[in-house]
């Protein structure tokens, strides 16, 4: 009888043939990475030597653009269209299938190149004639529902909140700008920033405002050719001497176009001596005016005694009597040096 070997299990696996290489053990592994690569070789996971013809070698890198091996995507020499898959024909942004006409909804051309010139398109949402309902930009703008009561209210277009993306001006959209377009991309199909996307009521108000502003700007336009000509010669003015009083300020005021001041009018009373005025009777002659005036000469001379306007500090009775020769107002007449004229 055979002995029962349970619970022991007999290993029936075949032994490793001596002609195959075995992966290095932990004792054979060195800390030097170069020796480890040389020890493992090409088939380091399966213990295959580099000289073995039947060994499974690693594949070359695969390109993510054309799916070919031997190069990476950054070095790929082929042009692959991501829309139609054409190779070495055109770029993705130039693919005919990616270009869709906003007028006939066909692919391969823009609105300006549409062969259906007679076809009319109108959006049922914003009443625009430049795109269909499926391409309306107001679809992703409708965040709040509007009641019927709010629709009945008259709409007012806030021009102070409308700015142009082309010139930065206020009061119009970028597609309707009259200035030269700053972007090199042609605006053939239009965008959402145009007056055509407004409702019927606001559209009329918008274009009426645009026409009014264009008329006002035309009034301020001028030709710059007038500045190219030589300036006109200026008239030469002769120099006048200091004693020539023909061009004094008084004569200039008389020759001006303004109205004369009130004291130059004939019907206004003109004073002759400080502190006294004439009567309202204009028939009195000038000689009678000066004869009828009464001036206390002695009082004037007494008041001038000791003041800076007195010609001398010495008081003489004869000088007081002859004080009528002095003017009854400021008699100060300095010399060239600016000092007072004192008699010694």
From Swiss-Prot:
SMART domains: ZnF_C2HC
GO cellular component, one term: nucleolus
SUPFAM superfamilies: Retrovirus zinc finger-like domains
Keywords: Metal-binding, Nucleus, Phosphoprotein, Repeat, Zinc, Zinc-finger
Highest taxon in the source lineage: Eukaryota
Subcellular location per the Swiss-Prot or TrEMBL entry: Nucleus
Molecular function in Gene Ontology: molecular adaptor activity; protein-macromolecule adaptor activity; RNA binding; zinc ion binding
Biological process terms in GO annotation: nuclear mRNA surveillance of mRNA 3'-end processing; nuclear polyadenylation-dependent CUT catabolic process; nuclear polyadenylation-dependent rRNA catabolic process; nuclear polyadenylation-dependent snoRNA catabolic process; nuclear polyadenylation-dependent snRNA catabolic process; polyadenylation-dependent RNA catabolic process; RNA fragment catabolic process; TRAMP-dependent tRNA surveillance pathway
Zinc finger (CCHC-type) in chain: 61-78, 99-116, 162-179
Biased composition (Low complexity): 317-337
Location (main, coarse): nucleus
Xref: Pfam families: AIR2-like_ZnK4 (PF21759), zf-CCHC (PF00098)
Residues that bear Phosphoserine: 31, 49
Region described as Disordered: 1-23, 227-274, 312-344
Subunit relationships: Component of the TRAMP complex (also called TRF4 complex) composed of at least HUL4, MTR4, PAP2/TRF4 and either AIR1 or AIR2. Interacts with HMT1 and NPL3. The interaction with NPL3 requires the presence of HMT1. Interacts directly with PAP2.
Protein purpose: Component of the TRAMP (TRF4) complex which has a poly(A) RNA polymerase activity and is involved in a post-transcriptional quality control mechanism limiting inappropriate expression of genetic information. Polyadenylation is required for the degradative activity of the exosome on several of its nuclear RNA substrates like cryptic transcripts generated by RNA polymerase II and III, or hypomethylated pre-tRNAi-Met. Both complexes polyadenylate RNA processing and degradation intermediates of snRNAs, snoRNAs and mRNAs that accumulate in strains lacking a functional exosome.
Other known facts: Present with 1800 molecules/cell in log phase SD medium.
Family, per entry: Belongs to the AIR1 family.
The protein's name: Protein AIR2
Lineage: Eukaryota, Fungi, Dikarya, Ascomycota, Saccharomycotina
